[in-house]
């Protein structure tokens, strides 16, 4: 059992609360999902629950976290740099203390990771995002554990592994606390919801806890929101009607008082005015106690404009090659792919089959065209983001005041606070970095977008806007994704990649 009492987490760099007065008891075996918009402090809360005694840059907290001194597993969003430099052999076998080999090999089989690779000299850093997640799950879950902490475990998973993850969480006897933006995963696995919100332009934290599954929580929240709106409107209508009557009475009394010359009558009218003013104070108090319109986090606002797409029939890409090496250890028997000026193509496939490698290969090939402008969004944002700069500095070309004001307005529409616009990009969450890259694409107005898992770090609130953004984009798109909703809404054709090549599929 884990007990959290009056936990408040503050971002010390801009003195802003991320978590406000969280109180929760987590029972053994409970499945707790932490949800919220990008940059709302989900990973900070999870890391603090993993190790309440740790020191965190730019974070302080008040309150208590009591949890049993029992073995636990923590799988972060990204594997650490020191582990990235290891070979697979060292990753799995450099420290074999308390490693259950039977579980290790069983998990490898369940996750379709070839156990012969355990002894490989291949570097962890060379693995795909999905493979890195798999080896973490295999190694960590093969050790004793009573509590499991997962930070966005579904981000890089193929559809087969996602099915495994849902089944694992649902049927596990251990306590599992996890962060996710995947509504399907949430609806099938969570029985308790911690919802982190930042309201009033991200200045006010609201932390909600409900012992409900995700679907019921979402429905209850929607119903309560609508009920509060209706109650606020009803009370406001009654208040406005009462105040209109009160103003008429007050005006009549004021007119009578001004026109009264008899002292006796004047005293009576003055007494009546006193009663009217007393009633006015009661109305003022009533206004303060009225049901307020509910606060809600703003959805993002972003759209492409001023783009002149290439002609529909113009070929941007027309490949038909056999035995093509797109990387030192990746050969495709027959790569056949064409892309026209306004076509939107999606690529799917198992973890480690080479989707991101292929996409980068195509990006490099297409970048050689001098008559084509390309916007590129890799899976790992830091590969192209200058993390030492602020978002405003990154997006600025001239640095003049008017340009910075326009950029600030765009960032505000993506729910960046003033402080977040001016902090280093390295301080941003994964989702905020994703938003920043989206804005960069919009401001560049490219004719072709090459996107690697573009929805992976976005919340359920932001994802519909992201899908709509790319659906309405008038140019061509070449994208890799495991997000079925995104693929169905945006792409006209979808291909599955394996060692044989690309095959058009329906999903």
Task: Locate predicted features.
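Coupling and communication elements adjacent to P-loop NTPase active sites across diverse families
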Residues: 1-11, 99-122, 220-328
């Amino acid at each position: 059992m884990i007990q959290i009492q009056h936990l408040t987490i503050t971002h010390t760099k801009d003195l802003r609360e991320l978590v406000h007065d969280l109180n929760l008891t987590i029972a053994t075996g409970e499945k707790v999902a932490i949800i919220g918009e990008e940059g709302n402090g989900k990973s900070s809360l999870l890391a603090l629950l993993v190790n309440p005694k740790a020191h965190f840059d730019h974070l302080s907290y008040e309150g208590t976290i009591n949890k049993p001194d029992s073995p636990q597993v923590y799988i972060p969003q990204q594997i650490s740099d020191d582990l990235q430099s290891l070979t697979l052999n060292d990753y799995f076998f450099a420290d074999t203390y308390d490693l259950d080999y039977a579980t290790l090999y069983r998990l490898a089989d369940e996750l379709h990771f070839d156990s012969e690779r355990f002894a490989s000299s291949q570097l962890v850093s060379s693995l795909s995002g999905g493979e890195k997640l798999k080896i973490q799950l295999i190694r960590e879950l093969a050790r004793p554990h009573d509590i499991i902490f997962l930070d966005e475990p579904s981000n890089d998973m193929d559809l087969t592994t996602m099915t495994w993850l849902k089944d694992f969480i649902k049927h596990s006897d251990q306590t599992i606390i996890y962060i996710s933006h995947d509504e399907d995963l949430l609806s099938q696995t969570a029985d308790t919801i911690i919802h982190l919100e930042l309201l009033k332009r991200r200045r006010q934290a609201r932390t909600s806890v409900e012992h409900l599954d995700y679907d019921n929580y979402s429905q209850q929240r929607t119903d309560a929101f609508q009920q509060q709106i209706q109650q606020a409107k009803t009370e406001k209508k009654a208040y406005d009607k009462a105040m209109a009557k009160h103003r008429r009475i007050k005006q009549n009394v004021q007119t009578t008082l001004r026109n009264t010359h008899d002292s006796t009558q004047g005293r009576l009218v003055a007494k009546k005015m006193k009663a009217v003013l007393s009633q006015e104070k009661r109305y003022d108090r009533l206004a303060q106690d009225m049901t307020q319109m509910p606060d809600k986090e703003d959805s993002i606002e972003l759209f492409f404009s001023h783009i002149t797409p290439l002609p529909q029939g113009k070929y941007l890409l027309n490949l038909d090659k056999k035995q093509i090496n797109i990387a030192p250890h990746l050969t495709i028997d027959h790569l056949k792919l064409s892309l026209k000026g306004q076509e939107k193509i999606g690529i799917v496939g198992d973890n480690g089959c080479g989707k991101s490698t292929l996409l980068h290969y195509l990006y490099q090939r297409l970048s050689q065209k001098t008559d084509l402008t390309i916007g590129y969004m890799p899976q790992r944002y830091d590969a192209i983001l200058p993390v030492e700069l602020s978002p405003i500095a990154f997006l600025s070309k001239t640095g003049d005041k008017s340009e910075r004001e326009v950029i600030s307005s765009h960032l505000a529409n993506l729910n960046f606070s003033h402080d977040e616009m001016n902090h280093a990009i390295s301080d941003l969450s994964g989702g905020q970095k994703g938003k920043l890259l989206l804005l960069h694409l919009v401001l560049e107005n490219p004719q072709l977008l090459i996107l690697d898992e573009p929805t992976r770090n976005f919340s359920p609130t932001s994802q519909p806007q992201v899908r709509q953004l790319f659906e309405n984009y008038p140019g061509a798109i070449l994208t890799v994704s495991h997000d079925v909703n995104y693929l169905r809404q945006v792409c006209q054709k979808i291909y599955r990649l394996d060692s044989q090549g690309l095959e058009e599929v329906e999903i």
